[in-house]
Every structure is written in C-alpha cells, then in structure tokens.
Amino acid sequence: MAGEIQDPFSLSFQGNSIHSGSISFGRFEKEGLSWEKRSSFSHNRYLEEVDKCSKPGSVTEMKAHFEAHFKKKGIRFPASLESQTWGVHQTSNEPDDEAVHATESFEDYRSDGSFSEDTSQSNSVCNYSHEQEKCGQGKSQCEFDEESDHCVSYDEILVNSDEVIELDEEEGGGDHGRVADLVECENLGPPEMPQEIVIQDSALVEEAGSKLDEHASKKPSNSMETPSSSVNVKPIIPNDVRVTKASTKGHDVTPKAASRRTKGSSLSSNSKTNVDAKSQKELRPKKTIESQPKSSNKTETRPPIATNRCKTSTTSSKLEMSTGSTSFRFKCSERAEKRKEFYMKLEEKIHAKKTETNQVQAKTQQKAEAEIKQFRKSLNFKATPMPSFYNIGTRPVSHNKTEPSKVAQSRSRPATSASITNRAVTRVSYKHGFEEAEMVKVMVSNRKQSAAKDSDLQKGNLMAVEMKQQIGARRSRN
C-alpha cells in the first residue's frame, strides 16, 4: 500500500518540476502566450506585413524584388520620384487596355506572391501605359499631357486640351531608344539607334517662352478666368530629356496617344521634334545622351490653341464664399441686436422703477404738506401781544468787584420769573384754550433753558473774578 501511494505523488512532483514556475489560471512561464488564440478581436492580417516592413533593410529588398518582377513582366519600374508623382497625377476617366492588363497581372501577383506594395507605387506603375503603333514611313505620334517648365498649375488651366508630340524616326536597326522626361513614354525603335532631338525655329522659342511667362504672370494660381482669344502653345522641351538604350526587348514599341482630360487640366501644346539620322554614327557607343540646353534648342511653335477656362466654377466658389461669410456675419449681427435689445429692456425697466419711486415720494410729500396745512388751519391761532415778562431784561452784572448780596439777589430773580410765567400760562389757558396753552408752555420752557444758561455764565464769571482776586492778594503779600 505504501508503494502504491508514493508512485502517483512522485509522478505529480515530476510534472510540476517540468514547468518549473507556475502562474495563476493554469498557465506557466514557459508556455507560449499567443494573444490571437485567446483574444476576442479578429486577427489583422496586415500586421504581419507591417512587421516585415519594419525590419531594417526590408524596403531595399522589396524594391529589388519588384524591379526583378517588373523586368520579367516587361514593364519599366519607375526609377525616380518624379516619375512616381507623374504616374499618380495622370489619372484618366478612360484607362488604356494595357494599363488594365498591367493592373490585373500585378493583382494576380499580389494574390500569389508573398509581398505587397504601397498603393502609391502600384498606382504609379499601373497608370503607366504603352501601345504599339507603326506608320508607313516609320513616323510615330505620341499624344500626351506634358507639364511645362513654366509652372502653370492644374487649377489654372482647364479641360478639353490635347497635346501632340510627333517624333520622326527612321526605321533601320534592331535596338530601340527610350525618352525619359517628366512624362514617361517609351520610343522603342530599331536596335542600337540612339537619337538626338533636334528642334527647329529657334526664333520662335523665345516668343513662345515670353508668351508663357506673360500668361503665367497674368493669371494667379487660384483664379480661373476665360480668355477672349485662343491660345496655342508648344512647350520647350526641358534639359532632362534623355535618350536611353533599351537592354532587353527587340520589338518596336511606340508610345500611344495618352490624351487625358483631367479636371484640373494641363497646358495644351503641340510640338514636333525631328530626329536626325546623322547623329546615329556619332552616338552609337553612348548609352544615354542628354539633349542640348534650352538656348541651343530649336522649337517649332504654332498659333495658340483655344484654352477654355470656365467662369462658372469661379463664380460659384465666390458665391459660396460670399454666402458663407454673409451667413456668419448675419449670425453675429443677430446676436449683437439681441444683446442691444436686452440691454435696452433692462434700462427701460430701471428707468420705470426710478420714475415709480419718484412718483411715490412726490405723492407722500404732497400728502404730508396737505396734512400740515390742514392742521395749521384747524389750530385757528391768532397773534396776541407777548406778555410783559418777556420785555423784562436781566441787569448787567459788573465783572469787577461784586458783593455776595448782589449775587444772592440775582439768584432769586429766576424764581420770580418762573412764577410769572406760570401765571401767564394759566391766564392763556383760560382765555385761548388748551392747544394755545401748550404752545405757551413750550415757549416758557425755552426761556427757562436760556435763563439757566445765563445763570451758569454768571456763575462762571463770578468764579473767575474770585480767582483773580485771590491771585492778586497772594502777589501783594509776597
């Protein structure tokens, strides 16, 4: 029994020692915690691609991979940022057949392959189109919208303008050249035939340049106006025009008419370039040949083509701006008017309260005055001669030497005056009534107060005289 009990205990101890450190909820430190299994959120498959691209050197690997892929497909991979941006800008309402074919093949590759490309790169590659055309005399025409060097923006110049560049080639060899401009367009001619672009009529180049400068200076980038006269301008081909050799393909491919009508259209211009066959012998060993500077270029210009700019779009935008501004101002003015009305109402209320209080005060004053008048009329007071004791004046006290007998006499006089006033009050009360007697009592009390004040003054004067006498006696003794 003891052996049977010890065996499962030892097995459980060994199982715990395998995991070594345990975490709560039945998980262990060495166990792989994949959040995809336990999370309620759906797995985002793009995170894996982000992890791949976040590693250092992944961008260069993808670039090399896609370059090899596009070389196999026969499509030229965009080599510069300018070509990428040109491919993004050159969007059309009617895509070409081979561009659609390129997009389909690229999407098939994305579904099969392990890498995914940015949208900007894929758009720039897919928007690139080329098509084969052959003429009887070996001339190829390429219609495309070209961005001129005079920086005329897409908003300035309007739609319905097509641009034609005719490249005159001589058929002869097996190799083909490639012209790399801001607009990418492949001219695949006979083999080992580098081409030099020769442009005619140098006198007309300056006229076209001056016209373009004046046109760009007169029209700002944001404003759109309809010109009265039609304009036909052929751009000067920039210095960046290069003729390169194609390395792999032996078939002839000429650029198709890629005339596109964009909403913010580019400048309409027609230019013809003639390619001389004499320069072939001189330029065979070179792979890339740069064109001569603008001063040596000769351009053939034609009378200007009509460029239509719509005034309705500008007027509509101006109307929208004006309506927006007027609505905003109208709201502000409404708020200001409401505030003014509110303050006016407050002022009117305050003025009304003030007028009410003033009216109440005036009414109370009028009532008080009327009551006083009525009270005076009810008294029936008549002016009577003053009693004789008011005419009796007190004798002036000598401030010099006075005797105590005189002081005693002056003290006894107010008592006699008080008795006289009492007698006068009694007489008045009998004659004129009770109200007049009260008035006389008030007058008598006032007289008593004045007499008491006079007596106090007399006492003070007497005390001062006594003090002076004492001081004089002391001095005489000394």
Curated annotation (Swiss-Prot):
Function per UniProt: Microtubule-associated protein (MAP) that regulates the orientation of interphase cortical microtubules.
UniProt record similarity statement: Belongs to the TPX2 family.
Keyword entries, A-Z: Cytoplasm, Cytoskeleton, Microtubule
Species of origin: Arabidopsis thaliana (Mouse-ear cress)
Compositional bias (Polar residues): 219-232, 264-277, 309-326, 407-420
Protein name per UniProt: Protein WVD2-like 7
GO biological process, one term: response to abscisic acid
Pfam families: TPX2 (PF06886)
